[in-house]
Amino acid sequence: MADDVKRVVVWSTGGIGALSIVAVQERPDLELVGVWVHSEEKVGKDAGELANGVPIGITATNDVDALLALEPDCVVYAASGPERDAGAIPDYERLLAAGVSVVTTTSTTLINPMAYVPDHRVRLEAAAAAGGASIFASGIEPGFLCDQLPLVFSTACRSVSKVHCYELALYDDYGVEEIMIDALGFGRPLDFEPWIMLPGAIAGEFQGQIRYIADGLGVEVEDIRETYDRRLTDQPIDTALGTVEPGNCGAIRFQAIGVVDGREAIVIDHITRLARHVAPDWPIGEADLSYRVVLEGKPNFECWITPTLDDPAEAGIPTMGSGAGAMLATAMRVVNAIPYVVDAQPGLLRSLEMPLTLPRHAVRAS
């Protein structure tokens, strides 16, 4: 990996984008040269003030040509929205074709390009080849805890019979209606049919992770099964979206299950509640957001992970509760990867073929 300073543009000043701005500014091997914003109200404002209230002398813009003229080596792409890929693919194509590498938290299924939407993959491969650039998607989940980490544990195994990864979360402070209600079905009675109930929705969203693990272990996935269950609350729950009354959905559980040799061998298991009292018979995390990775084999491995952040306000995300540590970890998965992605061969990258994206200049007193 080359030691030269990489020029960076951050795309969006939402939670992940804001954290990325601060992180890039701290790194002597990275130089923040520009920031893209969607809202006209943010255009012309100091990007540092938008991120965490501290001016940095870089003016936010929505002019892509102006940002490309800055000759960045890489863009940290952190835009969000209900139709993420639909909006992001044209941006990725333009950046890659211009010779700018991309690290992204937006397109979660791109963590495994081999299982990405074929049309999107072909378009991105062509753009990357034309510009001689690379694109890499990551995050904490997906992108690390329930896909890369199990493979790390497997390096100490003689045999592996099953991989089971859990995300155990309390989402009472998450106030995005199109996700919480429309997609997941929280706060609604059982006759409400959210997006996640559509046949193939869960398998489609998580097949990349399952195939990533299978590729790493050298096995073939014969089928991907899916399950979805929900439980009603029997008492009112105060949430960021208002009060959820008794008789409405207060917890959901969904699984994507990879079948290998006729067995359910790889399981991604998400259990999400609005309050800890709902569905007490389901596994409960050690904290409001926890992850559990279980490998059954020789030897067995079980690991609990709870990402936390002592001072979310200092980090620039004062309204975040239990998810603050995970949000920062998501940002750092791509920020730390920047030098490796810029120096990689052109194309669509995944962690399986990359070196560990170890952070440089991260060891300090605080």
Q: Could you say what each language-model-derived stretch is?
A:
Residues 1-98, 218:
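N-terminal glycine-/serine-/threonine-rich beta1-alpha1-beta2 phosphate-ribose binding loop
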Residues 11, 15, 19, 62, ...:
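Conserved active-site and cofactor/substrate-binding residues in soluble primary-metabolism enzymes
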Residues 11, 154-283, 287, 291:
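Active-site-lining helix/loop region of Rossmann-like oxidoreductase modules
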Residues 14-16, 83, 109-112, 116-117, ...:
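Gly/Ser/Thr-rich loops at beta-strand to alpha-helix junctions
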Residues 38-40, 81, 100, 106-110, ...:
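Short, ordered loop/turn segments at secondary-structure junctions
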Residues 89-90, 98, 106-133:
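Rossmann-fold NAD(P)-binding glycine/threonine-rich loop
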Residues 144-155:
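Alpha-helical support elements that line or immediately flank enzyme active sites
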Residues 238-366:
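C-terminal active-site/capping subdomain that shapes the small-molecule cofactor and substrate pocket
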